[in-house]
Amino acid sequence: MLHIAYSLKELDFAALMAVYGEGNRENGEYFYPELTPGEALRRAEQDFYDYLSQDFFQADGALYALWEVQGAYVSALRLEPYREGYLLEALETAPDKRGRGYANSLMGAFLTFAREKGMLPIYSHIRKGNVPSQRVHSACGFTVYKDLAVYIDGSVDYKCNTWKFL
C-alpha cells in the first residue's frame, strides 16, 4: 500500500531506518571510521534525521513515498522540486525484502499518484552500474535523458545518468 508523507511527523523514522539500514551502515563506516560499527550507524541515522528535518522537509513540495506490506515499510523514495519538475531520490528496498517486486509496486503506485497531482516531469539520477535500479525505472516508464547527473546543489556527477519520466 502506498503511503505519502509530507513531514517527518508523518513517518515512522525507526521503520524508515530499517529500509535504509544497508546504506546507513555504509555511510557510518565511511564518515565515522573511528567509531564502533554500532556508534557509526547511530551517527549516520542521526545525520539522516537531521537532513530530513532541517533540509529536505523544509522544501515546498518535498515528500516521502513508502510501500507498506502488513503495516511495515519495505520500500521508500524521496521526491523534491527540481528544475521544472521533481527529482526522485533514494529509491531503496529493505535488503531482506528485495526480489519481491516492492520497488516496482512503489514506483508504479507513486507515479500514478504523481501524474494525478500534475507532478511531472520527474527526474532520477542513477549510477551507471546500478542495474537493479535501472530495471525498475525502465519498467516504470523512465528513459535515459542525460549521460550525467546535475544535482540540486549544481554539482555534476559523470558516474550517473539522469532518467526522466513524463
Predicted regions and their residues:
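Polar/charged side chains located within well-ordered beta-strands of beta-rich proteins
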Residues: 2-3, 20, 24, 62, ...
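Acetyl-CoA-dependent GNAT
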Residues: 10-11, 18-89, 94-95
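A generic structural signal for beta-strand entry/edge sites
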Residues: 83-85, 121, 155-158
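A short, internal acetyl-CoA/4′-phosphopantetheine-binding micro-motif in the GNAT/acyltransferase core
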Residues: 91-99, 126-127
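Conserved acetyl-CoA pyrophosphate-binding loop and the N-cap/start of the following alpha-helix
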Residues: 97, 101-109
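Conserved active-site alpha-helix within GNAT-family acetyltransferase domains
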Residues: 104, 128-146
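Conserved GNAT acetyl-CoA-binding A-motif
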Residues: 114-126
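Conserved catalytic-core motifs of GNAT/GCN5-like acyltransferases
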Residues: 125-126, 141-160
